[in-house]
């Protein structure tokens, strides 16, 4: 399936403030593609989410996060499952600020020149995890192409501080690709490897130029393969979105590539456009197709596959890890 609503254009020459956090149209105005909306597809009946309410832990979690000056990808990326996850007392923590150095047009995380790293963040994160008595946490980050190590050292500090205060808590990290710094980053991560190493491929290679400008499909596969070679006992994990214009066979081919690179855990979920400025949804995948992807995943040898319309990379990550034997 082609993507006719994504066309080339020259970068915007409008003045902008690189220090400000840019979202939606402001964020995407300077990438070398223009996102044009075609027909807006009606959401099918199987797309349903729960909103947080005052009777859940939703606001309690938000207050604790603000108190410790922390961000969650749940909030920054406008995850549709935020109500359910916050209500269950779980969250995916996003470290190194809330401004990403990339401008992926599917993602709702803000772009801008990042602030200096907060030296207190690792301890604040550890205190928050301890206060919430979390048994399984996911730590992710914005891309930090401005840092010589891509932020890997900060990941290590967060893991170490968390294990000091919560030694029984299992830690999954969802990392950027450490573009051009992968060997350095992997060497640094040796000091405190996580319990699960996650890096998302996001989409099929044909759509990388539109959906993941600045990223490389093979580079991402190799990052996980190299990590697995260094830490054979640590499960590796990756995730895909469907609905950007890919075909079912392209998804299956990516799954085969994942297994060929030693990736053991898989997530596949429906892409939902955060705004009209983002890449449009080209199709809503039927539950039967998700079921087919799941069945094929286990045939290929994945230890665990979380596949469904509302599945996200860190959605029920604890249950995914435990089902995979972590």
Curated annotation (Swiss-Prot):
Residues 85-303 form the Radical SAM core domain. Keywords: 4Fe-4S, Cytoplasm, Iron, Iron-sulfur, Metal-binding, S-adenosyl-L-methionine, Transferase. It catalyses: [[Fe-S] cluster scaffold protein carrying a second [4Fe-4S](2+) cluster] + N(6)-octanoyl-L-lysyl-[protein] + 2 oxidized [2Fe-2S]-[ferredoxin] + 2 S-adenosyl-L-methionine + 4 H(+) = [[Fe-S] cluster scaffold protein] + N(6)-[(R)-dihydrolipoyl]-L-lysyl-[protein] + 4 Fe(3+) + 2 hydrogen sulfide + 2 5'-deoxyadenosine + 2 L-methionine + 2 reduced [2Fe-2S]-[ferredoxin]. InterPro entries: Aldolase_TIM, Elp3/MiaA/NifB-like_rSAM, LIAS_N, Lipoyl_synth, rSAM. The keyword S-adenosyl-L-methionine applies. It is an enzyme of class 2 (transferase). Pfam families: LIAS_N, Radical_SAM. It is found in: Cytoplasm. Its cofactor is [4Fe-4S] cluster. Its EC number is 2.8.1.8. PROSITE patterns: RADICAL_SAM. It comes from the Bacteria. Signal peptide: none annotated. Pathway: Protein modification; protein lipoylation via endogenous pathway; protein N(6)-(lipoyl)lysine from octanoyl-[acyl-carrier-protein]: step 2/2. CDD domains: Radical_SAM. Binds 2 [4Fe-4S] clusters per subunit. One cluster is coordinated with 3 cysteines and an exchangeable S-adenosyl-L-methionine. [4Fe-4S] cluster 2 binds at residues 100, 104, 107. Belongs to the radical SAM superfamily. Lipoyl synthase family. PANTHER family: LIPOYL SYNTHASE, LIPOYL SYNTHASE, MITOCHONDRIAL. This is Lipoyl synthase. It comes from Acidovorax ebreus (strain TPSY).
């Amino acid at each position: 399936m082609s993507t006719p609503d994504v066309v080339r254009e020259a970068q915007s020459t409008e003045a902008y403030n690189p220090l400000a956090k840019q979202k939606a149209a402001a964020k995407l105005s300077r990438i070398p593609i223009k996102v044009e909306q075609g027909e807006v597809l009606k959401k099918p009946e199987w797309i349903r989410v729960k909103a947080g309410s005052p009777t859940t832990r939703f606001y309690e979690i938000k207050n604790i996060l603000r108190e410790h000056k922390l961000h969650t990808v749940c909030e920054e990326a406008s995850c549709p499952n935020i109500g359910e996850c916050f209500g269950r007392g779980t969250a995916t923590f996003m470290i190194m600020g809330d401004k990403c150095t990339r401008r992926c047009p599917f993602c709702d995380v803000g772009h801008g020149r990042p602030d200096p790293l907060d030296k207190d963040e690792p301890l604040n994160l550890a205190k928050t995890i301890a206060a919430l008595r979390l048994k399984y946490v996911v730590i992710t980050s914005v891309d930090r192409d401005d840092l010589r190590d891509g932020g890997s050292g900060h990941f290590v500090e967060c893991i170490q501080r968390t294990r000091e205060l919560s030694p029984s808590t299992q830690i999954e990290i969802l990392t950027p690709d450490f573009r051009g710094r992968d060997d350095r980053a992997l060497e640094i991560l040796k000091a405190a490897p996580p319990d699960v190493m996650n890096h998302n491929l996001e989409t099929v290679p044909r759509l990388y130029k539109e959906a993941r400008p600045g990223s490389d499909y093979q580079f991402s596969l190799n990052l996980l393969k190299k990590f697995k070679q260094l830490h054979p006992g640590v499960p590796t994990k990756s995730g895909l979105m469907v609905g950007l214009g890919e075909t079912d066979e392209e998804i299956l081919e990516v799954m085969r590539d994942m297994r060929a690179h030693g990736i053991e855990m898989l997530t596949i979920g429906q892409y939902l456009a955060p705004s009209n400025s983002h890449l449009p949804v080209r199709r809503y995948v039927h539950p039967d197709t998700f079921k087919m992807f799941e069945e094929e995943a286990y045939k290929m040898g994945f230890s665990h596959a979380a596949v469904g319309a509302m599945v996200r990379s860190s959605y029920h990550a604890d249950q995914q890890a435990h089902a995979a034997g972590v």
